[in-house]
């Protein structure tokens, strides 16, 4: 492997998102997005406000370079095993 590609993690030929850039809470929110539940349900499960859930979603989509909550949910579903790992 060429050293310039050492940091690349690939799955099915695509670069794996940099989940390490997320905070613990952002990772929790992202993992819960895979369930397709609305923000108020995520807020209730996490014991935080819906506004805080929206803030976490805004932050994690920016960090991962994805434009929408729906795409974040699809990404979370695709990597659900990675996100739920301890």
Listing of model-derived features with the role each one plays in the protein:
Residues 25, 56-59:
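Residues within the DNA-recognition helix of helix-turn-helix
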Residues 31, 55, 74:
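DNA-binding alpha-helical recognition surfaces that contact promoter or target DNA
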Residues 61-86:
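Basic, Lys/Arg-enriched C-terminal extension of HTH/homeodomain DNA-binding domains
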Residues 40, 58, 70:
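Residues within the helices of the helix-turn-helix
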Residues 5, 56, 79:
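Histidine-centered active-site/metal-ligand motif
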Residues 1-19, 84-86:
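Intrinsically disordered or compositionally simple regulatory linkers and C-terminal tails
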Residues 10-52, 79:
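Helix-turn-helix DNA-binding segment
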